[in-house]
């Protein structure tokens, strides 16, 4: 667990998100406020497996993976908002996306800052606004929905 109550290191993130290499796309949570917002980062390196084919001459992080990372950040905020302990029986699924826009290319050496804000939650479905920044410049924005689901064994 992180030293501060409103941060999360990778060990804590792994307790909440089911994703693993190569699909775990959040490295650290720098700050969160339950029911309001979360700020997370992803360090993008040339060693990312997607750069082998997207694109070898001019490596670009696929936009869908930027959105997936944003969705992972919303899942973390949803768990923290509901004060729910990590459980293999509960997941927050990426349920929908609206108004996705890409403004800047993301490549090796970039650090993406994800800022997600909770707009509303009803019956286990949360609506969030997400933004991804690189060097203070907006790279991507979207409205994301995630749904809480219990997994039966």
Curated annotation (Swiss-Prot):
Keywords attached to this entry: Cytoplasm, Lipid A biosynthesis, Lipid biosynthesis, Lipid metabolism, Lyase
Any one GO MF annotation of this record: (3R)-hydroxyacyl-[acyl-carrier-protein] dehydratase activity
PANTHER family: 3-HYDROXYACYL-[ACYL-CARRIER-PROTEIN] DEHYDRATASE
Role noted for this protein: Involved in unsaturated fatty acids biosynthesis. Catalyzes the dehydration of short chain beta-hydroxyacyl-ACPs and long chain saturated and unsaturated beta-hydroxyacyl-ACPs.
Protein name: 3-hydroxyacyl-[acyl-carrier-protein] dehydratase FabZ
Gene Ontology biological-process annotations: fatty acid biosynthetic process; lipid A biosynthetic process
A GO CC term attached to the entry: cytoplasm
Pfam families: FabA (PF07977)
Enzyme nomenclature, EC number: 4.2.1.59
Active site: 54
Similarity-based family: Belongs to the thioester dehydratase family. FabZ subfamily.
High-level lineage: Bacteria, Pseudomonadati, Pseudomonadota, Gammaproteobacteria, Alteromonadales
Gene behind this protein: fabZ
Domain of life: Bacteria
Cellular compartment(s): Cytoplasm
InterPro entries named among the record's database cross-references: FabA_FabZ, FabZ, HotDog_dom_sf
Catalysed transformations (reactions): a (3R)-hydroxyacyl-[ACP] = a (2E)-enoyl-[ACP] + H2O
